Curated annotation (Swiss-Prot):
It comes from Actinobacillus pleuropneumoniae serotype 3 (strain JL03). This is Thiosulfate sulfurtransferase GlpE. GO terms for biological process: glycerol metabolic process. It is an enzyme of class 2 (transferase). It catalyses: thiosulfate + hydrogen cyanide = thiocyanate + sulfite + 2 H(+); thiosulfate + [thioredoxin]-dithiol = [thioredoxin]-disulfide + hydrogen sulfide + sulfite + 2 H(+). The keyword Cytoplasm applies. The active site is at C66 (cysteine persulfide intermediate). Keywords: Cytoplasm, Transferase. The gene is glpE. It is found in: Cytoplasm. InterPro entries: GlpE_sulfurtransferase, Rhodanese-like_dom, Rhodanese-like_dom_sf, Thiosulf_sulfurTrfase. Its EC number is 2.8.1.1. Belongs to the GlpE family. Transferase that catalyzes the transfer of sulfur from thiosulfate to thiophilic acceptors such as cyanide or dithiols. May function in a CysM-independent thiosulfate assimilation pathway by catalyzing the conversion of thiosulfate to sulfite, which can then be used for L-cysteine biosynthesis.
């Protein structure tokens, strides 16, 4: 089991999702998530954490994304401490994801 997470680019995150079925966990606030988020992202909050644990396998890769790639680091480290084996944080956060032209879902 890894003792820390790895920071990856938005494109590396997309490759993990496409090739290995990684779960992408968006930790931004509900309003921002509802407005737009990475395609198929799980909205991870204190309230949804129990469902996250039920749905996500500890051995599968988990990628955490936030606004700019800062607060996702804390959540990624927390998930490592909870026993998840392969945890990643997206450098640049959702801003970087969007600038990279990766798929998003929007309310508009």
């Amino acid at each position: 089991m890894s003792e820390t997470f790895t920071e990856i680019s938005p494109h590396q995150a997309w490759e993990l999702i496409e090739n290995e079925g990684a779960t992408l966990a968006d930790i931004r606030d509900g309003r921002r998530y509802a407005y737009s988020h990475p395609q198929d992202a799980f909205h991870l909050t204190n309230e949804s954490y129990g469902r996250f644990l039920d749905e996500v396998d500890y051995e599968e890769p988990v990628i955490v994304i936030c606004y700019h790639g800062v607060s996702s680091r804390n959540t990624a480290q927390f998930l490592v401490e909870q026993g998840f084996d392969r945890v990643y944080s997206v450098k640049g956060g959702f801003d970087g994801w969007e600038r990279s032209g990766l798929p998003i879902e929007t309310a508009y």
